[in-house]
């Protein structure tokens, strides 16, 4: 069934096409960053994970072009996973920047593990806060879904 001119689904085709183009550009950027950062394990792993996610999301993006509006949950899931990927790549870039500044202006023998060992208690608090955030968000979404259904 083809979308009619006034049903609003045909307007999303250009958004889905732009999404596919951005995903292809991001794949090129992350794979290039992986090659440029050889030797920095954390940065390589982060960019590799981002590149793998982008490759796996291409079929969903192509599906959104072929059938705009068929499954609105696809866009919501892709948006959420894209935000996680952006946060992960940003963390990798920040780690690379911090290590560069530490080597340039401070201790030349400093590495990520020596910096992280000073923040050990903070990492446990951050993980605890993340777990609580996910649990509370899930319970709120569940309650909202129940309110919508009934």
UniProtKB/Swiss-Prot annotation:
Lineage: Eukaryota, Viridiplantae, Streptophyta, Embryophyta, Tracheophyta
Stretches assigned to the Cytoplasmic side: 1-17, 63-82, 143-150
Pfam families xref list: CASP_dom
Descriptive protein name: CASP-like protein 2
Intracellular or extracellular location(s): Cell membrane
GO BP annotations listed: protein modification process
Gene Ontology CC terms: plasma membrane
NCBIfam families to which the protein is assigned, alphabetical: A_tha_TIGR01569 (TIGR01569)
Membrane-crossing residue ranges in chain numbering: 18-38, 42-62, 83-103, 122-142
């Amino acid at each position: 069934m083809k979308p009619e001119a006034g049903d609003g689904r045909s307007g999303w085709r250009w958004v889905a096409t732009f999404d596919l183009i951005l995903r292809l550009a991001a794949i090129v950027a992350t794979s290039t960053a992986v090659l440029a950062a050889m030797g920095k394990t954390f940065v390589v792993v982060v960019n590799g994970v981002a590149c793998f996610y982008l490759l796996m999301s291409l079929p969903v993006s192509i599906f959104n072009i072929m059938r705009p509006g068929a499954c609105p949950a696809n866009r919501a899931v892709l948006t959420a996973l894209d935000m996680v990927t952006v946060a992960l790549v940003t963390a990798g870039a920040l780690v690379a920047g911090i290590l560069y500044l530490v080597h340039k202006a401070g201790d030349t023998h400093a590495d990520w593990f020596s910096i992280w060992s000073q923040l050990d208690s903070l990492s446990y608090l951050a993980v605890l806060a993340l777990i609580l955030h996910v649990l509370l968000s899930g319970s709120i979404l569940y309650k909202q879904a129940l309110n919508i259904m009934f």
